[in-house]
A protein has these predicted regions:
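Membrane-anchoring hydrophobic helices of lipid-metabolizing enzymes
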Residues: 2-91
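Non-catalytic C-terminal accessory region of glycerolipid acyltransferases
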Residues: 2-5, 148-272
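Juxtamembrane loop-helix boundary motifs flanking transmembrane segments in multi-pass membrane proteins
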Residues: 5-13, 139, 146, 242
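Catalytic core of membrane glycerolipid acyltransferases/transacylases, capturing the structured
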Residues: 38-58, 87-144
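Structural element of the ATP-grasp superfamily
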Residues: 64-68, 106, 131, 189, ...
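Amphipathic coiled-coil/heptad-repeat helices and related helical stalk/stem segments
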Residues: 78, 99, 123, 150-151, ...
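Short acidic-hydrophobic, aromatic-tinged amphipathic segments that line or gate anion-handling sites
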Residues: 79, 137-140, 233
């Protein structure tokens, strides 16, 4: 590979540094410019909420689908099933989680969608502001009171006609093997009677993941995003049964995508 190609490491570092810097700069400008809007629209909370959602969705869509690919950080080679599931709003989207880019990429595709985040993120000043003015829900899965309060807030978001995005693994995976699912999203689906839409987000190389070399990955990183058929809760299901059905479906979808990549691992029993 030539010195101007993907394999020239200084060039790779430069491209990714520009990408990271532009993200943090744009996010800071967005938040700073948003403050006057929040103040001006305080008497009109519904208008404020809608405007912020539209602007943030447009920003994330441009950043993840146009700007970062233009820098050569990755290519999105496949997005399937999105048009079929968008009319189902409100719905609960559950996605596998391997890198920090997962959430903003999906939020750039899904308008009017809240997201569940860890409580430790919610304590950070920036996230605290986002939680107040956007549909971010902070939860501590180890605290019953936090889970109960978060379930209630999620139900309000869904009853308002908005989607919810959840990463049921809870944290970024260290391999291609799906981690055990937390039951929060599936308990919520049972209570609200709403479909669960499994989402696969797959990259040929790790990017901002819990793997060495993922900060400056070298090579042609191809992203595939698949929105699978909705899984509807039934009266016979409990949250565990619903979780298991979704887990198996996602694991089957990931297995051929992972084959021959760094994510390729021996499948757990639940693949079968």
């Amino acid at each position: 590979m030539t010195a101007t190609g993907q394999g020239f490491f200084p060039f790779t570092v430069f491209r990714f540094t520009v990408g990271y810097a532009s993200y943090f700069l744009a996010k800071s400008v967005f938040l700073v410019c948003g403050l006057p809007v929040l103040i001006l629209l305080t008497p009109f909370p519904s208008t404020k909420q809608l405007l912020l959602q539209v602007l943030s969705h447009a920003f994330l869509r441009f950043f993840t689908r146009t700007w970062l690919p233009a820098l050569g950080l990755y290519r999105i080679v496949e997005i399937t099933g999105l048009d079929q599931v968008l009319p189902l709003r409100p719905a609960i989207y559950v996605a596998n989680h391997r890198g920090y880019l997962d959430s903003i990429t999906l939020l750039g595709l899904l308008p009017r969608t809240g997201v569940l985040i860890k409580s430790r993120h919610g304590r950070q000043p920036m996230y605290h502001m986002l939680i107040r003015h956007f549909n971010l829900v902070s939860v501590d899965p180890n605290a019953l009171s936090s889970v109960s309060a978060s379930l209630e807030r999620c139900e309000r978001i869904l009853s308002g006609g908005e989607n919810l995005l959840v990463f049921p693994e809870g944290s970024r995976a260290r391999s291609g093997r799906l981690q055990r699912f937390n039951g929060f999203a599936f308990e919520l689906a049972q209570r609200a009677g709403l479909p669960v839409i499994p989402v696969i987000i797959h990259s040929t190389l790790p990017f901002m993941a819990k793997l060495p070399g993922s900060i400056f990955p070298r090579g042609d990183n191809q992203y595939r995003i698949r929105f699978l058929d909705p899984v509807h809760p039934t009266p016979e299901d409990d949250a565990d049964a619903l979780s298991d059905r979704v887990y198996r479906r996602m694991a089957r979808e990931l297995r051929p995508l992972d084959a021959g990549t760094i994510w390729d691992t021996e499948p757990p029993a639940r693949y079968d």
